[in-house]
């Protein structure tokens, strides 16, 4: 289901990112996407069989006193409402907590993206708060609100 993103995935991921429903949330596709546009991000391509369905990514805060990971995901709209998002997120969260040693995972999501919010809550995330005018609506000068969401492993080892 998840595989580290490589150059062979670029064409398929770029095609998904250029779909209007995805571009509305993620903005225009950078020339270097997905291999060089965010050097601090680690990315995994989501597959259903042999078909590219989307991508998850994370960035890490390595400072021991603030260690956490921030994640993001997009799916080809053809794969929405099939449980694929929560499954991919669960696999990524297991990797981050079990293999990478994180106890906290955060994300931000457009406040009007009810479908994504449901998927995140199904995965165990909770809303921390609403961030007002936290980013621009891609391709416009309008501001959008986002929820900050987190998942914290309990109980924490002291």
Question: How does the language model describe each region?
Answer:
Residues 1-35, 146, 155-158:
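A short, well-structured alpha-helix characteristic of acyl/acetyltransferase catalytic modules
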Residues 5, 75, 109:
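Hydrophobic adenine-recognition pocket in adenosine-nucleotide-binding enzymes
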Residues 12, 70, 87, 104, ...:
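Amphipathic alpha-helical recognition patches that constitute DNA-binding helices
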Residues 21-80, 95, 152-156:
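Acetyl-CoA-dependent GNAT
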Residues 81-95, 117-122:
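Conserved acetyl-CoA-binding loop-helix of GNAT-fold acetyltransferases
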Residues 85, 89, 113-116, 133-138:
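Short glycine/proline-centered loop/turn elements that form peptide/ligand docking sites
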Residues 106-109, 126-143, 148:
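Conserved catalytic-core motifs of GNAT/GCN5-like acyltransferases
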């Amino acid at each position: 289901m998840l595989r580290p993103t490589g150059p062979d995935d670029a064409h398929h991921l770029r095609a998904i990112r250029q779909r209007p429903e995805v571009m509305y949330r993620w903005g225009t596709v950078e020339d270097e996407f997905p291999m060089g546009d965010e050097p601090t991000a680690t990315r995994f391509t989501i597959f259903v069989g042999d078909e590219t369905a989307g991508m998850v990514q994370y960035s890490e805060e390595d400072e021991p006193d603030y260690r956490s990971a921030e994640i993001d995901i997009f799916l080809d709209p053809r794969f929405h409402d099939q449980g694929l998002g929560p499954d991919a997120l669960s696999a990524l969260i297991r990797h981050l907590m079990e293999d990478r040693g994180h106890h906290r995972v955060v994300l931000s999501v457009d406040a009007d993206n009810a479908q994504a919010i449901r998927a995140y809550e199904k995965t165990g995330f909770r809303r921390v708060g609403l961030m007002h005018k936290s980013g621009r609506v891609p391709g416009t000068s309008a501001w959008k609100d986002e929820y900050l969401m987190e998942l914290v492993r309990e109980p924490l080892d002291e």
